[in-house]
Amino acid sequence: FLSLIPHAINAVSALAKHF
């Protein structure tokens, strides 16, 4: 589960950068 957290943060970061 802890391995999934950085992936989610990276997705949110990429989404924020896209917008």
Curated annotation (Swiss-Prot):
Gene Ontology biological process: defense response
Main location: secreted
Source species, domain of life: Eukaryota
Protein name: Phylloseptin-8
Keyword terms of this UniProt record: Amidation, Amphibian defense peptide, Antimicrobial, Secreted
Subcellular compartments: Secreted
GO cellular component, one term: extracellular region
Keyword DNA damage: no
Residues that bear Phenylalanine amide: 19
Organism in which the protein naturally occurs: Phyllomedusa tomopterna (Tiger-striped leaf frog)
Family designation: Belongs to the frog skin active peptide (FSAP) family. Phylloseptin subfamily.
Keyword Secreted attributed: yes
Entry comment describing in which tissues the protein is expressed: Expressed by the skin glands.
Role description: Has antimicrobial activity.
